[in-house]
Every structure is written in C-alpha cells, then in structure tokens.
C-alpha cells in the first residue's frame, strides 16, 4: 500500500480546517498512519522545501511554514499519492476545481491550506524528514476488503 506525506499548513490550522482535511482523506478510503501537530522548525522547513531554495519566494515560504502550528500526516492507501493530490486540487486555487480542498478553501497560491508529496521519491523523503519509522502505525480499515478487491 502506497504512503504519502500530507501537511495541513498554518493557514489551514488557523482557519479550523484540520478536521475537514482529515474527513476528506478518510472518506476517500485512505488511512492516516501518523499524525502530529507542531510548529515546524526552520531547519526542518528548509530541508523539506530545499528544492525551492533558489526561488525568490523561498524566504517567505519558510517564514510562513514556521509561523504557526501545522499538522503533518503519513497517509496510506491504493494510489495514495495520486488520490491525495486529486483531493487537494491544483496548487493555485484559481485553477483548483470546486470540491477540492484548495478549490473550496484556499485563499491564494501562498496560502493554499495543504501540501502533499508529488512522487514516491518525494513521499519517502518527506516522511523521513517529519517522522521516525517507529512513529508510523500499521492497521487495517474494516472496509479495506471492499476498497481494494
């Protein structure tokens, strides 16, 4: 079963959208294997978003991500990366379809509520940045037989 990393960013936490995000994840048949709310340290944020280090928006991105609590999750399920990115919607909320998290709640591209890994490699890297293996649970949903026949 594929795993991905998901973060409800500080704007999503501050706007009370954590429960909404979790509900949408679980309603799509995905399961949450790990969850933590914390203020991400600057060094961790820089490691997570390192591929953007040369971009002009990098300093403001790091400032935003470390500005308040966020919720980090390990989410698993069949095609979890693809499904989670579909749930999130396009990065720019102008392009995000209604019914997606960003289409329904994001205010602008810099305050777009949620992050999810975009590839298996990114998922493995991001999960390792935010969680130890011992913090990731293992369980079966009672509906997995129906979901993954």
From Swiss-Prot:
Cellular component terms per the entry's GO annotation: cytoplasm
GO biological process: CTP biosynthetic process; GTP biosynthetic process; UTP biosynthetic process
E.C. number: 2.7.4.6
MF annotations from Gene Ontology: ATP binding; metal ion binding; nucleoside diphosphate kinase activity
InterPro entries: NDK-like_dom, NDK-like_dom_sf, Nucleoside_diP_kinase, Nucleoside_diP_kinase_AS
Catalytic activity: a 2'-deoxyribonucleoside 5'-diphosphate + ATP = a 2'-deoxyribonucleoside 5'-triphosphate + ADP; a ribonucleoside 5'-diphosphate + ATP = a ribonucleoside 5'-triphosphate + ADP
Alphabetized UniProt keyword annotations: ATP-binding, Cytoplasm, Kinase, Magnesium, Metal-binding, Nucleotide metabolism, Nucleotide-binding, Phosphoprotein, Transferase
Main location: cytoplasm
Pfam families: NDK
Function (record text): Major role in the synthesis of nucleoside triphosphates other than ATP. The ATP gamma phosphate is transferred to the NDP beta phosphate via a ping-pong mechanism, using a phosphorylated active-site intermediate.
Protein name: Nucleoside diphosphate kinase
UniProt organism field: Methanosarcina acetivorans (strain ATCC 35395 / DSM 2834 / JCM 12185 / C2A)
Taxonomic path: Archaea, Methanobacteriati, Methanobacteriota, Stenosarchaea group, Methanomicrobia
Gene name as annotated: ndk
């Amino acid at each position: 079963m594929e795993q991905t990393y998901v973060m409800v960013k500080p704007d999503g936490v501050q706007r009370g959208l954590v429960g909404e995000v979790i509900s949408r994840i679980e309603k799509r048949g995905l399961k949450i294997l790990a969850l933590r709310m914390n203020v991400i340290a600057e060094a961790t944020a820089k490691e997570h978003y390192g591929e953007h280090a040369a971009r002009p928006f990098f300093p403001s991105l790091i400032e935003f991500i470390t500005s308040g609590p966020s919720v980090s999750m390990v989410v698993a399920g069949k095609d979890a990366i693809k499904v989670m990115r579909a749930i999130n919607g396009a990065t720019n909320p102008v392009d995000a379809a209604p019914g997606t998290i960003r289409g329904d709640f994001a205010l602008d591209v810099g305050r777009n509520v949620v992050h999810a890994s975009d590839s298996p490699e990114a998922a493995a890297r991001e999960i390792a940045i935010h969680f130890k293996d011992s913090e990731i649970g293992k369980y079966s949903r009672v509906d997995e037989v129906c979901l993954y026949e």
